[in-house]
């Protein structure tokens, strides 16, 4: 389980990215890099880090499922992820 402050910070960053997305795209298209540098640092989508939706774990994140490998494995074994089953060959 990640620290509550880190999860809150990630949510705040996501909110900032959405808030400034159109303004950032317009400045980028215009080539106004000075204007871009005056925007808040956390409004850049590059600074976002994917986190597990269940417990906020930042490492071993699987984009397709939106969770870490640990939670993915646990839920897959329980059969709670549709279309996922144990491989055998």
Curated annotation (Swiss-Prot):
One of its GO terms (molecular function) is rRNA binding. GO terms for cellular component: cytoplasm; small ribosomal subunit. One of its GO terms (biological process) is translation. SUPFAM superfamilies: Glucocorticoid receptor-like (DNA-binding domain). Binds 16S rRNA, required for the assembly of 30S particles and may also be responsible for determining the conformation of the 16S rRNA at the A site. PANTHER family: 30S RIBOSOMAL PROTEIN S14, SMALL RIBOSOMAL SUBUNIT PROTEIN US14M. This is Small ribosomal subunit protein uS14. The lineage of its organism: Bacteria, Bacillati, Bacillota, Bacilli, Lactobacillales. The gene is rpsN.
């Amino acid at each position: 389980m990640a620290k509550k402050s880190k999860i809150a910070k990630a949510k705040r960053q996501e909110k900032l990215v959405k808030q400034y997305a159109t303004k950032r795209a317009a400045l980028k298209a215009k080539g106004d890099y000075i204007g871009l540098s005056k925007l808040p640092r956390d409004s850049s989508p590059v600074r976002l880090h994917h986190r597990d939706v269940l417990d906020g774990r930042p490492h071993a994140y699987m984009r397709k499922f939106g969770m870490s490998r640990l939670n993915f494995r646990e839920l897959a074994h329980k059969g709670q992820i549709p279309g996922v089953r144990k491989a055998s060959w």
